[in-house]
UniProtKB/Swiss-Prot annotation:
GO terms for molecular function: GTP binding; GTPase activity. This is ADP-ribosylation factor 1-like 2. A lipid is attached at G2 (N-myristoyl glycine). Keywords: ER-Golgi transport, Golgi apparatus, GTP-binding, Hydrolase, Lipoprotein, Membrane, Myristate, Nucleotide-binding, Protein transport, Transport. Belongs to the small GTPase superfamily. Arf family. It is found in: Golgi apparatus membrane. SUPFAM superfamilies: P-loop containing nucleoside triphosphate hydrolases. Residues 3-16 are annotated as: Important for the stable binding to the membranes. Pfam families: Arf (PF00025). The gene is arf-1.2.
């Protein structure tokens, strides 16, 4: 009987956990975002070959964030991280108009995967501090987000170096997690 109350208590007051996969083309800002969330500071990054994983505590939720390298040669490895992913953060360099079509192809390829069918999608339209950056509405259009059916998605304009928009994105993810449990 005590176990029942223990579970109930943990459900009401305990920490929730969410497994997040963060992907996007190379140089979109994934690693900068991860460490801005984790440490609150800008770190010097090099291209990620493989992955970085960190736990980010926010609003009584423990987000385990997997930041996976985005270079074209290693994108086929993304699928090895799909299992048990509850939330997908897709990071887009809003200033890279030449590769936004490539970003859309990679995103749509991933969203077609059965293992990600229940994952919610958060798009970070990153590098908003740059003068030529596409705004969130333009990125939404270029990625074809309005065509998504049967998937919860949200786009957030961000600047990884200042942190602008990052916690608003986590707010949306935490609300999605609460609504599903």
């Amino acid at each position: 009987m005590g176990n029942v109350f223990g579970s109930l208590f943990k459900g009401l007051f305990g920490k929730k956990e969410m497994r997040i996969l963060m992907v996007g083309l190379d140089a979109a800002g994934k690693t900068t975002i991860l460490y801005k969330l984790k440490l609150g500071e800008i770190v010097t990054t090099i291209p990620t070959i493989g992955f970085n994983v960190e736990t980010v505590e926010y609003k009584n939720i423990s987000f385990t964030v997997w930041d996976v390298g985005g270079q074209d040669k290693i994108r086929p490895l993304w699928r090895h991280y799909f299992q048990n992913t509850q939330g997908l953060i897709f990071v887009v360099d809003s200033n890279d108009r030449e590769r936004v079509g490539e970003a859309r192809e990679e995103l749509m390829r991933m969203l077609a995967e059965d293992e990600l069918r229940d994952a919610v999608l958060l798009v970070f339209a990153n590098k908003q501090d740059l003068p030529q950056a596409m705004n969130a509405a333009e990125v939404t259009d270029k990625l074809g987000l309005h065509s998504l059916r049967n998937r919860s998605w949200y786009i957030q304009a961000t600047c990884a170096t200042s942190g602008d928009g990052l916690y608003e994105g986590l707010d949306w993810l935490s609300n999605q997690l609460k609504n599903r449990s």
